[in-house]
Amino acid sequence: MAYHESMYFLVFLPVVLIGYQLAPKRVRFGVLLFFSYCFYFLFSHRLIVYLLGATTITYLTGRLVATGEKKRRKTILIVGVWLLLGMLLVMKYSGFFAENVNALFGTINLGLRLPVRRFLLPLGISFYTLSAIGYMADVYWKKIEPEKNIAKLALFLSFFPIIMEGPICMYSDTAETLAKGEDIRSENLIRGYMRIGWGLLKKVVIADRLYVVVQTLFDGYASYHGVMIVVAAVSYTVQLYMEFSGCMDIVIGSAECFGVTLPENFAQPFVSKNASEFWRRWHISLGRWFKTYIFYPVSMSKLTRKWNRFAKKHTSKYIMLMVASAIAFFPVWVCNGLWHGANWSYLFYGMYYFVVIMIELMLEPAVKKLCAAWKIAEDAAWWNVLRILKTWVIIFTGELFFRADTLGIGMHMFRSLFHDFSIQKLWDGTLLTLGLGRVEIGIILVSLLIVGVVNHFREQQIDVRGVILQKRLPVRWLVYLALIFVVLIFGAYGPGYQEVDLIYAGF
């Protein structure tokens, strides 16, 4: 019962809404907790004990950190964080670590071998672990008061719309609203289900249709080169964006039905003018978490302060800032890569963006001088278009390695990009051999155009749903029915289509 399945939004969600509304206000958070645990148990069964364990550790750590002495508070926080990280590291990374240590032992003929064990990963562990660590850190920094009711904390960590794919919430984002138990309002229901419908369009009409092309190109990578590698990278990037952002639409819409506002996870990332801006618009909640709990602490660490004091005396301000930035960014991008999975491709992906962003920072003063010398206005349309196109190249290259099954395959595909690059393959019928016909490709292109128009309005701070709700009843119903019609008629599901799992649910 994934978010995009009819059983979720036509059966499960309405049942929860009815049960929630019928319950007394003071226990509605308990109703949400009950259904959230039921939802989790459907996917993870006995692995729910890890969620229960993480919740208990988080609760006790928060309470002890808030009441402990100054010296003990830090020790308690460190123990709590490492208990949570320990579960995540063992479940997600122990096999990867053992494989690479064994490879090293084999290289030096040491004769030792670690057992390689693969664990079934509990649903959402990468998401709720970060939320739990953020909660404990916020209590330690006295940004929030510790939650006294463990059930309310459990709901914050397990709320069913966010447990599978996020967004990664801070306690201050949702906890108070979840605990209030406000009445369900018709406007919230309408806005919520409109958002769910929009997410379904992106997921089942576009992303699931592109899945066929992506699988064909990446599974048969050895047979493709030149412009077809570009098609592979672009197709996967669009598939990933449409699926992940579509899922976020469903998630945010589901929460909105209860009057709960979740943080946005995407903000039109493909209008970004550089890689840094892209990551401020893409998977926003993950970037915010890394910035708050890794980047800022490292920036204020003893190592960084020592470097700054040394650099002020012996180097230029430029070198001081670049090295300080590298010190803070490096652990962020290592963690970003490994958070996605135990794979060298993911680690390379993180290091790729570390290098790209550092190059952008280093070149920024020179670019500004160049623009001033050539009298290029920063807001000139042609200049911004060039910067956006440059960022697209960076994004598509990164996603090529991100999607490749191994780093070696990613390297092979990247090298193949420069072999026999014939743009003619885009219209000579080659695209029609990838699993989609002309009609299917046409559906994708028209749907992308619709999404692009809506994203343009959102970039202009226009509330599209609000505009629709202000229209007369016949117009509103025309929009509702059109959205339902598009999803039902053009969705890539049923006979002839392969069911596509949610990509980020695997992280």
What would you call each of these model-derived segments?
Residues 1-506:
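Membrane-embedded transmembrane alpha-helical bundles that form the catalytic cores
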